[in-house]
Amino acid sequence: MSKVITKYDLVGDTLVLILAGGRGSRLHELTDKRAKPALYFGGNRRIIDFALSNCINSGLNRIGVITQYAAHSLLRHLQTGWSFLPQERGEFVDMLPARQQIDDNTWYRGTADSVYQNMAIIKNHYKPKYILILAGDHIYKMDYSQMILDHVNSGAKCTVGCIEVPRESAKEFGVMAVNENLKVKAFVEKPSDPPAMIGKPNSSLASMGIYVFNAEYLYETLERTVNSPQTSHDFGKDIMPMALEDEVLYAHPFDRSCMGRNTEGEIYWRDVGTLDSYWQSNIDLVSKEPQLDIYDQTWPIRGNPVQAYPSKFFYDDPACKQVDNSLIAGGCVITNASISYSVLFDNIHVNEGTLIDESVILPQVKVGKNCILKRCIVDRHVQIPDGMQIGVDPEEDSKHFRISSKGIVLVTEKMLQKMKGETVKSEDDLD
Protein backbone atom coordinates (compact mmCIF):
# COMPACT_ATOMS: atom_id res chain seq x y z
CA MET A 1 0.00 0.00 0.00
CA SER A 2 1.44 3.35 -1.01
CA LYS A 3 1.84 5.99 1.68
CA VAL A 4 -0.67 8.83 1.72
CA ILE A 5 1.22 12.10 1.31
CA THR A 6 0.40 14.79 3.87
CA LYS A 7 1.36 18.45 3.79
CA TYR A 8 3.79 17.80 6.64
CA ASP A 9 5.76 15.48 4.35
CA LEU A 10 6.30 18.25 1.79
CA VAL A 11 7.40 21.32 3.74
CA GLY A 12 10.94 20.02 4.27
CA ASP A 13 11.39 19.65 0.51
CA THR A 14 10.20 23.21 -0.16
CA LEU A 15 12.17 26.43 -0.47
CA VAL A 16 10.27 29.70 -0.06
CA LEU A 17 11.36 32.76 -2.05
CA ILE A 18 9.77 36.05 -0.98
CA LEU A 19 9.99 38.77 -3.63
CA ALA A 20 10.66 41.92 -1.59
CA GLY A 21 12.52 44.18 -4.00
CA GLY A 22 9.65 46.36 -5.18
CA ARG A 23 9.36 50.07 -4.55
CA GLY A 24 5.59 50.42 -4.50
CA SER A 25 5.47 53.56 -6.63
CA ARG A 26 1.72 54.06 -6.08
CA LEU A 27 2.50 54.78 -2.43
CA HIS A 28 4.50 57.81 -3.59
CA GLU A 29 6.66 59.47 -0.88
CA LEU A 30 5.76 56.78 1.64
CA THR A 31 8.20 54.45 -0.13
CA ASP A 32 10.85 57.01 -1.08
CA LYS A 33 13.28 55.59 1.48
CA ARG A 34 11.95 52.11 2.14
CA ALA A 35 10.86 49.12 0.08
CA LYS A 36 7.13 48.49 0.17
CA PRO A 37 7.46 45.21 2.15
CA ALA A 38 9.30 47.17 4.87
CA LEU A 39 6.45 49.65 5.31
CA TYR A 40 4.90 49.76 8.78
CA PHE A 41 1.51 48.14 9.34
CA GLY A 42 -0.95 47.56 12.15
CA GLY A 43 0.74 49.50 14.95
CA ASN A 44 3.91 47.47 15.42
CA ARG A 45 4.51 45.23 12.41
CA ARG A 46 5.77 45.59 8.84
CA ILE A 47 4.03 44.33 5.73
CA ILE A 48 6.54 41.53 5.09
CA ASP A 49 5.83 40.08 8.55
CA PHE A 50 2.60 38.59 7.19
CA ALA A 51 4.30 36.49 4.50
CA LEU A 52 7.09 35.48 6.89
CA SER A 53 4.65 34.56 9.68
CA ASN A 54 2.54 32.54 7.26
CA CYS A 55 5.68 30.59 6.36
CA ILE A 56 6.61 29.81 9.97
CA ASN A 57 3.02 28.94 10.90
CA SER A 58 2.85 26.65 7.84
CA GLY A 59 5.98 24.76 8.92
CA LEU A 60 8.09 26.30 6.14
CA ASN A 61 11.43 27.23 7.67
CA ARG A 62 13.69 27.48 4.60
CA ILE A 63 13.16 31.02 3.37
CA GLY A 64 15.04 33.33 1.02
CA VAL A 65 14.09 37.02 0.80
CA ILE A 66 14.99 38.64 -2.52
CA THR A 67 15.71 42.36 -2.08
CA GLN A 68 16.72 45.28 -4.28
CA TYR A 69 15.15 48.74 -3.89
CA ALA A 70 15.96 50.78 -0.73
CA ALA A 71 16.68 47.57 1.14
CA HIS A 72 18.50 48.86 4.22
CA SER A 73 15.53 49.11 6.60
CA LEU A 74 14.20 45.78 5.34
CA LEU A 75 17.54 44.06 5.89
CA ARG A 76 17.83 45.47 9.42
CA HIS A 77 14.31 44.29 10.19
CA LEU A 78 15.09 40.77 8.97
CA GLN A 79 18.39 40.64 10.86
CA THR A 80 16.96 41.84 14.17
CA GLY A 81 13.52 40.25 14.04
CA TRP A 82 13.80 37.11 11.93
CA SER A 83 17.15 35.53 12.78
CA PHE A 84 15.80 33.08 15.36
CA LEU A 85 15.60 29.94 13.18
CA PRO A 86 18.27 27.32 14.06
CA GLN A 87 20.56 27.04 11.05
CA GLU A 88 22.09 23.85 12.41
CA ARG A 89 18.73 22.23 11.64
CA GLY A 90 18.73 23.57 8.10
CA GLU A 91 16.29 26.37 8.91
CA PHE A 92 16.94 29.96 7.86
CA VAL A 93 15.75 33.31 6.61
CA ASP A 94 18.45 34.22 4.09
CA MET A 95 18.73 37.58 2.35
CA LEU A 96 19.32 37.52 -1.41
CA PRO A 97 20.16 41.07 -2.55
CA ALA A 98 20.65 42.00 -6.19
CA ARG A 99 24.23 41.07 -7.04
CA GLN A 100 24.36 42.06 -10.70
CA GLN A 101 25.25 38.56 -11.84
CA ILE A 102 24.49 39.23 -15.52
CA ASP A 103 26.91 42.15 -15.73
CA ASP A 104 27.98 45.13 -13.63
CA ASN A 105 25.06 47.27 -14.83
CA THR A 106 22.21 44.77 -14.60
CA TRP A 107 20.02 44.71 -11.51
CA TYR A 108 16.98 42.48 -11.25
CA ARG A 109 15.01 43.11 -14.43
CA GLY A 110 11.72 41.69 -13.16
CA THR A 111 10.21 39.18 -10.76
CA ALA A 112 11.28 36.13 -12.76
CA ASP A 113 14.76 37.53 -13.32
CA SER A 114 15.23 38.01 -9.58
CA VAL A 115 14.83 34.25 -9.18
CA TYR A 116 16.87 33.46 -12.29
CA GLN A 117 19.85 35.45 -11.01
CA ASN A 118 19.83 33.36 -7.83
CA MET A 119 19.27 30.05 -9.61
CA ALA A 120 22.80 28.72 -9.08
CA ILE A 121 22.50 29.20 -5.32
CA ILE A 122 19.03 27.67 -5.30
CA LYS A 123 20.07 24.59 -7.28
CA ASN A 124 23.46 23.95 -5.73
CA HIS A 125 23.01 25.10 -2.14
CA TYR A 126 19.33 24.85 -1.18
CA LYS A 127 18.47 21.91 -3.51
CA PRO A 128 14.67 22.03 -3.12
CA LYS A 129 12.14 19.73 -4.73
CA TYR A 130 9.45 22.42 -4.68
CA ILE A 131 9.72 26.21 -4.73
CA LEU A 132 7.08 28.53 -3.29
CA ILE A 133 7.19 32.07 -4.69
CA LEU A 134 5.54 34.82 -2.63
CA ALA A 135 5.02 38.54 -2.95
CA GLY A 136 6.25 40.28 0.18
CA ASP A 137 3.73 43.11 0.08
CA HIS A 138 0.26 41.68 0.77
CA ILE A 139 -1.77 41.43 3.98
CA TYR A 140 -3.40 38.03 4.64
CA LYS A 141 -3.17 34.79 6.61
CA MET A 142 -2.64 31.58 4.67
CA ASP A 143 -1.52 28.00 5.26
CA TYR A 144 0.92 27.55 2.39
CA SER A 145 1.40 23.87 3.18
CA GLN A 146 -2.17 23.18 2.02
CA MET A 147 -1.42 24.84 -1.32
CA ILE A 148 1.74 22.75 -1.71
CA LEU A 149 -0.22 19.56 -0.96
CA ASP A 150 -2.88 20.49 -3.53
CA HIS A 151 -0.11 21.19 -6.05
CA VAL A 152 1.40 17.74 -5.61
CA ASN A 153 -1.95 15.92 -5.59
CA SER A 154 -3.10 17.64 -8.80
CA GLY A 155 -0.02 16.58 -10.75
CA ALA A 156 0.67 20.21 -11.67
CA LYS A 157 4.14 21.54 -12.39
CA CYS A 158 3.00 25.05 -11.52
CA THR A 159 0.15 26.18 -9.26
CA VAL A 160 -1.03 29.77 -8.85
CA GLY A 161 -2.98 31.06 -5.86
CA CYS A 162 -6.22 32.78 -6.85
CA ILE A 163 -8.98 34.83 -5.29
CA GLU A 164 -12.32 36.17 -6.49
CA VAL A 165 -12.25 39.98 -6.84
CA PRO A 166 -14.68 42.58 -8.20
CA ARG A 167 -14.31 42.75 -11.96
CA GLU A 168 -13.59 46.49 -11.92
CA SER A 169 -10.61 45.86 -9.60
CA ALA A 170 -9.14 43.00 -11.65
CA LYS A 171 -7.24 45.29 -14.02
CA GLU A 172 -4.39 45.34 -11.48
CA PHE A 173 -3.97 41.55 -11.42
CA GLY A 174 -3.41 38.53 -13.58
CA VAL A 175 -6.84 37.08 -14.42
CA MET A 176 -7.55 33.42 -15.20
CA ALA A 177 -10.26 30.96 -16.18
CA VAL A 178 -10.27 27.40 -14.82
CA ASN A 179 -12.14 24.15 -15.48
CA GLU A 180 -13.90 21.94 -12.94
CA ASN A 181 -10.55 20.39 -11.93
CA LEU A 182 -8.98 23.84 -11.38
CA LYS A 183 -6.75 23.46 -14.40
CA VAL A 184 -6.08 26.92 -15.81
CA LYS A 185 -7.47 27.26 -19.32
CA ALA A 186 -6.78 30.97 -19.88
CA PHE A 187 -4.54 33.58 -18.26
CA VAL A 188 -4.02 37.27 -19.04
CA GLU A 189 -1.90 39.71 -17.06
CA LYS A 190 -3.52 43.02 -16.02
CA PRO A 191 -6.20 43.11 -18.74
CA SER A 192 -7.90 46.39 -19.62
CA ASP A 193 -11.21 44.50 -19.85
CA PRO A 194 -11.00 41.66 -17.31
CA PRO A 195 -12.94 38.52 -18.23
CA ALA A 196 -15.71 37.60 -15.79
CA MET A 197 -16.11 34.28 -14.00
CA ILE A 198 -18.69 31.88 -15.43
CA GLY A 199 -22.01 32.64 -13.78
CA LYS A 200 -20.56 35.68 -11.97
CA PRO A 201 -20.58 38.61 -14.39
CA ASN A 202 -19.31 41.09 -11.79
CA SER A 203 -16.37 39.00 -10.54
CA SER A 204 -13.01 37.88 -11.90
CA LEU A 205 -10.63 35.16 -10.73
CA ALA A 206 -7.39 36.99 -9.93
CA SER A 207 -3.85 35.81 -9.30
CA MET A 208 -2.54 36.46 -5.78
CA GLY A 209 1.07 36.48 -6.96
CA ILE A 210 1.66 33.20 -5.11
CA TYR A 211 3.15 30.29 -7.05
CA VAL A 212 4.25 26.72 -6.30
CA PHE A 213 6.64 25.13 -8.80
CA ASN A 214 8.28 21.79 -9.20
CA ALA A 215 11.84 23.05 -8.92
CA GLU A 216 13.10 21.42 -12.12
CA TYR A 217 10.23 22.87 -14.11
CA LEU A 218 10.94 26.35 -12.76
CA TYR A 219 14.61 26.11 -13.73
CA GLU A 220 13.61 25.02 -17.23
CA THR A 221 11.08 27.81 -17.76
CA LEU A 222 13.44 30.47 -16.43
CA GLU A 223 16.09 29.36 -18.92
CA ARG A 224 13.55 29.47 -21.75
CA THR A 225 12.30 32.89 -20.67
CA VAL A 226 15.66 34.59 -20.26
CA ASN A 227 16.65 33.61 -23.80
CA SER A 228 13.45 34.93 -25.35
CA PRO A 229 13.83 38.31 -27.14
CA GLN A 230 10.28 39.30 -26.12
CA THR A 231 10.69 38.55 -22.41
CA SER A 232 9.55 40.93 -19.69
CA HIS A 233 11.35 38.83 -17.05
CA ASP A 234 8.04 38.61 -15.19
CA PHE A 235 6.11 35.71 -13.66
CA GLY A 236 2.70 37.02 -14.69
CA LYS A 237 3.64 38.13 -18.19
CA ASP A 238 6.04 35.34 -19.13
CA ILE A 239 6.09 32.30 -16.83
CA MET A 240 2.33 31.87 -16.38
CA PRO A 241 1.59 31.95 -20.15
CA MET A 242 4.40 29.45 -20.67
CA ALA A 243 2.99 27.07 -18.04
CA LEU A 244 -0.45 27.52 -19.58
CA GLU A 245 0.89 26.60 -23.02
CA ASP A 246 2.63 23.57 -21.51
CA GLU A 247 -0.73 22.55 -19.97
CA VAL A 248 0.77 22.13 -16.50
CA LEU A 249 -0.81 25.16 -14.77
CA TYR A 250 -3.40 24.72 -12.01
CA ALA A 251 -5.13 27.14 -9.65
CA HIS A 252 -5.41 27.04 -5.88
CA PRO A 253 -8.43 28.96 -4.50
CA PHE A 254 -7.47 31.00 -1.45
CA ASP A 255 -10.53 29.85 0.49
CA ARG A 256 -8.95 26.36 0.71
CA SER A 257 -6.04 27.64 2.79
CA CYS A 258 -7.18 30.94 4.30
CA MET A 259 -6.63 31.14 8.05
CA GLY A 260 -8.73 33.27 10.37
CA ARG A 261 -12.01 34.03 8.63
CA ASN A 262 -14.24 36.67 10.19
CA THR A 263 -17.59 35.99 11.86
CA GLU A 264 -19.30 36.15 8.46
CA GLY A 265 -16.97 33.47 7.09
CA GLU A 266 -15.31 35.96 4.76
CA ILE A 267 -11.69 35.60 3.69
CA TYR A 268 -9.21 38.48 3.92
CA TRP A 269 -6.49 39.37 1.41
CA ARG A 270 -5.38 42.91 0.66
CA ASP A 271 -2.97 44.49 -1.77
CA VAL A 272 -2.01 47.67 0.12
CA GLY A 273 -0.31 49.19 -2.91
CA THR A 274 -2.03 52.59 -2.86
CA LEU A 275 -2.34 55.30 -0.21
CA ASP A 276 -6.08 54.66 0.01
CA SER A 277 -5.79 50.88 0.43
CA TYR A 278 -2.90 51.23 2.91
CA TRP A 279 -4.87 53.72 5.02
CA GLN A 280 -8.08 51.67 4.85
CA SER A 281 -6.40 48.37 5.78
CA ASN A 282 -4.86 49.97 8.87
CA ILE A 283 -8.06 51.76 9.91
CA ASP A 284 -10.05 48.52 9.46
CA LEU A 285 -8.14 47.09 12.42
CA VAL A 286 -9.76 49.46 14.95
CA SER A 287 -13.28 48.06 14.45
CA LYS A 288 -14.80 45.82 17.14
CA GLU A 289 -14.62 42.69 14.98
CA PRO A 290 -12.18 43.43 12.14
CA GLN A 291 -11.98 41.13 9.15
CA LEU A 292 -8.29 40.60 9.98
CA ASP A 293 -7.80 39.44 13.56
CA ILE A 294 -4.26 40.44 14.57
CA TYR A 295 -4.86 39.09 18.10
CA ASP A 296 -5.43 35.48 16.99
CA GLN A 297 -2.77 33.41 18.74
CA THR A 298 -3.61 30.27 16.75
CA TRP A 299 -2.01 31.94 13.70
CA PRO A 300 0.23 34.66 15.16
CA ILE A 301 1.78 37.43 13.09
CA ARG A 302 5.30 37.78 14.40
CA GLY A 303 7.52 40.80 13.93
CA ASN A 304 10.19 42.88 15.62
CA PRO A 305 8.31 45.17 18.00
CA VAL A 306 10.25 48.13 19.35
CA GLN A 307 11.37 47.84 22.97
CA ALA A 308 9.48 50.70 24.59
CA TYR A 309 7.91 51.63 27.90
CA PRO A 310 4.13 51.31 28.16
CA SER A 311 2.15 54.09 26.57
CA LYS A 312 1.09 56.88 28.92
CA PHE A 313 -2.25 58.70 28.86
CA PHE A 314 -2.52 61.87 30.96
CA TYR A 315 -5.87 63.63 31.27
CA ASP A 316 -6.72 66.36 33.76
CA ASP A 317 -9.20 68.14 31.48
CA PRO A 318 -12.67 66.56 31.76
CA ALA A 319 -13.68 68.22 28.49
CA CYS A 320 -11.31 66.01 26.49
CA LYS A 321 -12.89 63.13 24.60
CA GLN A 322 -9.79 61.03 25.31
CA VAL A 323 -9.10 57.88 23.25
CA ASP A 324 -11.61 55.54 21.62
CA ASN A 325 -11.62 52.86 18.92
CA SER A 326 -7.88 53.12 18.27
CA LEU A 327 -4.67 51.09 18.30
CA ILE A 328 -1.86 52.70 20.33
CA ALA A 329 1.59 51.08 20.28
CA GLY A 330 4.20 51.27 23.04
CA GLY A 331 6.15 54.35 24.06
CA CYS A 332 3.40 56.87 23.22
CA VAL A 333 2.62 59.84 25.47
CA ILE A 334 -0.88 61.30 25.03
CA THR A 335 -1.66 64.47 27.00
CA ASN A 336 -5.19 65.90 27.06
CA ALA A 337 -5.73 64.96 23.40
CA SER A 338 -8.68 63.36 21.62
CA ILE A 339 -7.88 60.33 19.46
CA SER A 340 -10.49 58.27 17.64
CA TYR A 341 -10.52 55.58 14.96
CA SER A 342 -6.76 55.86 14.47
CA VAL A 343 -3.60 53.75 14.50
CA LEU A 344 -0.59 55.18 16.35
CA PHE A 345 2.73 53.39 16.04
CA ASP A 346 5.47 53.51 18.69
CA ASN A 347 6.97 56.53 20.47
CA ILE A 348 4.46 59.17 19.37
CA HIS A 349 3.88 62.28 21.48
CA VAL A 350 0.52 64.06 21.17
CA ASN A 351 0.11 67.32 23.07
CA GLU A 352 -2.88 68.97 24.70
CA GLY A 353 -5.83 70.24 22.78
CA THR A 354 -5.06 68.14 19.71
CA LEU A 355 -7.64 66.05 17.85
CA ILE A 356 -6.63 63.03 15.75
CA ASP A 357 -9.37 61.24 13.81
CA GLU A 358 -9.19 58.38 11.28
CA SER A 359 -5.44 58.73 10.89
CA VAL A 360 -2.41 56.45 10.63
CA ILE A 361 0.61 57.91 12.45
CA LEU A 362 3.95 56.15 11.87
CA PRO A 363 6.66 55.93 14.57
CA GLN A 364 8.43 58.75 16.39
CA VAL A 365 6.06 61.55 15.39
CA LYS A 366 5.55 64.59 17.61
CA VAL A 367 2.22 66.42 17.34
CA GLY A 368 2.05 69.90 18.86
CA LYS A 369 -0.71 71.59 20.83
CA ASN A 370 -4.18 72.37 19.45
CA CYS A 371 -3.68 70.51 16.15
CA ILE A 372 -6.30 68.76 14.04
CA LEU A 373 -5.38 65.69 11.97
CA LYS A 374 -8.19 64.04 10.02
CA ARG A 375 -7.91 61.18 7.53
CA CYS A 376 -4.12 61.47 7.39
CA ILE A 377 -1.10 59.26 6.96
CA VAL A 378 1.81 60.89 8.81
CA ASP A 379 5.24 59.48 7.98
CA ARG A 380 7.91 58.62 10.51
CA HIS A 381 9.86 61.39 12.33
CA VAL A 382 7.41 64.15 11.34
CA GLN A 383 7.01 67.04 13.79
CA ILE A 384 3.62 68.73 13.50
CA PRO A 385 3.82 72.33 14.80
CA ASP A 386 1.32 73.82 17.25
CA GLY A 387 -2.02 74.76 15.79
CA MET A 388 -1.64 72.97 12.44
CA GLN A 389 -4.80 71.66 10.80
CA ILE A 390 -4.51 68.86 8.21
CA GLY A 391 -7.43 67.10 6.59
CA VAL A 392 -9.79 70.02 7.23
CA ASP A 393 -9.33 72.20 4.12
CA PRO A 394 -8.56 70.14 0.96
CA GLU A 395 -7.61 73.22 -1.04
CA GLU A 396 -5.06 74.31 1.53
CA ASP A 397 -3.76 70.75 2.00
CA SER A 398 -3.19 70.37 -1.74
CA LYS A 399 -0.68 73.24 -1.67
CA HIS A 400 1.68 71.38 0.64
CA PHE A 401 0.81 67.70 0.90
CA ARG A 402 -0.20 64.78 -1.30
CA ILE A 403 -3.92 63.99 -1.38
CA SER A 404 -5.13 60.61 -2.61
CA SER A 405 -8.07 60.00 -4.91
CA LYS A 406 -10.27 59.38 -1.85
CA GLY A 407 -9.04 62.39 0.10
CA ILE A 408 -6.41 60.81 2.34
CA VAL A 409 -3.62 63.31 3.12
CA LEU A 410 -0.01 62.09 3.18
CA VAL A 411 2.34 64.18 5.34
CA THR A 412 6.13 63.77 5.33
CA GLU A 413 8.87 65.75 7.06
CA LYS A 414 10.21 66.92 3.71
CA MET A 415 6.79 68.36 2.81
CA LEU A 416 6.66 70.28 6.09
CA GLN A 417 10.18 71.61 5.59
CA LYS A 418 9.20 72.96 2.17
CA MET A 419 6.00 74.42 3.59
CA LYS A 420 7.94 76.33 6.24
CA GLY A 421 10.55 77.48 3.73
CA GLU A 422 13.30 75.52 5.45
CA THR A 423 16.23 73.88 3.74
CA VAL A 424 15.21 70.32 2.98
CA LYS A 425 17.47 68.06 4.97
CA SER A 426 18.76 64.84 3.51
CA GLU A 427 17.14 61.80 5.08
CA ASP A 428 18.91 58.59 5.93
CA ASP A 429 17.20 55.28 5.32
CA LEU A 430 17.55 53.96 8.87
CA ASP A 431 13.83 53.39 9.00
Curated annotation (Swiss-Prot):
Assembly mode: Homotetramer.
Record-level GO BP terms: glycogen biosynthetic process
Protein name: Glucose-1-phosphate adenylyltransferase
Protein role: Involved in the biosynthesis of ADP-glucose, a building block required for the elongation reactions to produce glycogen. Catalyzes the reaction between ATP and alpha-D-glucose 1-phosphate (G1P) to produce pyrophosphate and ADP-Glc.
UniProt similarity note: Belongs to the bacterial/plant glucose-1-phosphate adenylyltransferase family.
Organism (species): Actinobacillus succinogenes (strain ATCC 55618 / DSM 22257 / CCUG 43843 / 130Z)
An MF annotation (GO) of this entry: glucose-1-phosphate adenylyltransferase activity
Pfam families, alphabetized: Hexapep_GlmU (PF24894), NTP_transferase (PF00483)
Enzyme class, UniProt record, top EC level: transferase
EC number: 2.7.7.27
Keyword Nucleotidyltransferase carried by entry: yes
The keyword ATP-binding is assigned to this record: yes
Phylogenetic classification of the source organism: Bacteria, Pseudomonadati, Pseudomonadota, Gammaproteobacteria, Pasteurellales
InterPro entries: ADP-Glc_PPase, ADP_Glu_pyroP_CS, GlgC_bac, GlmU/GlgC-like_hexapep, NTP_transferase_dom, Nucleotide-diphossugar_trans, Trimer_LpxA-like_sf
Binding site for alpha-D-glucose 1-phosphate: Y108, G174, E189, K190, S207
Keyword set, alphabetical order: ATP-binding, Carbohydrate metabolism, Glycogen biosynthesis, Glycogen metabolism, Nucleotide-binding, Nucleotidyltransferase, Transferase
Catalysed reaction equations from the record: alpha-D-glucose 1-phosphate + ATP + H(+) = ADP-alpha-D-glucose + diphosphate
Pathway: Glycan biosynthesis; glycogen biosynthesis
